[in-house]
Amino acid sequence: MLRSADCGSLRDENAGDHVTLAGWVGRRRDHGGIIFLDLRDRSGAVQVVFNPETDADATRVAEEVRGEWVVQVKGTVNRRPEGSENPAMATGDVEVMVTEITVLNRSLTPPFYIEEDAEADESLRLRYRYLDLRRPPMLRNLTLRHHVVKYIRDFLSDRDFLEIETPILIKSTPEGARDFLVPSRMQPGNFYALPQSPQQMKQLLMVSGIERYFQIARCFRDEDLRADRQLEFTQLDLEMSFVEEDDILDLTEELYIGMIESVTPDKKLRKPFPRITHAEAMERYASDKPDIRFGLEMTDVSELASETEFRVFLSTMEGGGQIKGFVVPGQAGFVTGQMKDLDDTAKASGAGGLAHIRYRGTNPVGQLSENEILQSAGLRMPAEWHRRLADKMGAGPGDMILLMAGRQPRLNVWLSAMRTHVSELLELTDPDELAFAFVTKFPLFDWNEDAKRWDSSHHPFTSPEDGQEGELDGENLGDIKSKAYDLVCNGSELASGSIRIHNRQLQEKIFAILGHSKEEVESRFGPILEAFEYGAPPHGGIAPGIDRLVAILCGSPSIRDVIAFPKTQSGTDLLFEAPTPVDPKQLEELSLRITEKPD
């Protein structure tokens, strides 16, 4: 070995030890001929010292050393002189007096500083990702990711799950997003697809009698990117036979609580995880992935709004819309600039605007004077009306009420955006708090207004609620609930799952409602339908995203910070310069030809 100890492992109790270290040179300081270097490896950094009076040869070499050179040093661990300790370093009580140094490799001047906070554009960091990953925060992120995955594997293995790998090259059966297609050289004109998820394969494993399966699965979706999406991503894929919904949720909660308390014990974890229905989440939070760290819960005030002469409210309700909003406690003192910010936020989300009421007095709302009730222009109502509004919404003197008008589902989108904005404006959330919740009983179908058809709310293999199978022949398909569930945390969806259909006739009926012809169904889903006729057991599962979970645990706004080699939002790999054109000979072998896309 080229080293006997890790740089970040040295402590006061190591004083007097003779050590050999190896790593990268960080900060350099010269003081009166004495050279101080921070030597860094994956474990951390330690100060190494070169004194020309005791080790002239080593000091001469150190004079040439520059940042990010790779060196090996030998020396003795000493306690730092009193007053020179560095509490910002884990090794700040000690230093290594060097007697010998060997340059293992030199380095060009890096395009950005390799330190805690790199003041560099993200595109530059991605272009030199191998340098970016040397920075302590990136190393911490990847280390945490490793511990998360290891905990998952150990947890499930201890509970009799089998880790089974499913194919990467599969048949194209689009699940909502576009497939990545892979041409077959041996069968010209035919294509494989990269899996968007191992959905059918894990269900077939249940038919196979595996009973408890998991894998850390790579998934691929050709979709537009954003901060929490990548073209390729990693999820825990988990499936169980002979279970009901609560069995899956109980296991998932146990997994998450144990994992978080093990790998990030400093996080403030709310437990147990509440379970709320989709309808309740939309009613209370205007979102199916609510952040429950704070209140600001919704109230439908359409009935009271109908008593006003406010044209916006009345025209909205005449068109089948609602008036909903929430109370912002203690914020009646918002000034004109702050109110304009709220109105701009409403319009940016797609809403026409925002109605507000501020109760600035100290008396009960019903006793406030006209001058103490600040209302949006056009909304002029007497104190008695405000008393009833305040009673319904739970508002009081000193509070502000925000109201929005519109038709669903857009109204909830606007309200959710406003709720999030207000929480950020008032700093209502603790970044170290993790507030998980299960959202259950999603609709089985969503109406696609553009295509004039029903789509699966989750995916077509989701089972309807018990007792609602007969309603599949009716006209109120939007009222049918499913055995689908999501795990959400701090306003993000972390996992999605369901109890699956395991009966061919029911599965074919779902496909028919979704508009798939019998020929299409047989072509795309024939194997799993046939398998259902050979004793398929009741089964269900869940698929937590690894990238998003680790990003939340790390406090990162982007999953790119927890993936070793991510793509940009345009799907470009800046390090390897992918995608790129390929050699025409490769296209010829695949029987492919590039054609110009018509305007």
Which residue ranges define each predicted feature?
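Class II aminoacyl-tRNA synthetase catalytic cores and aaRS-like
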Residues: 1-599
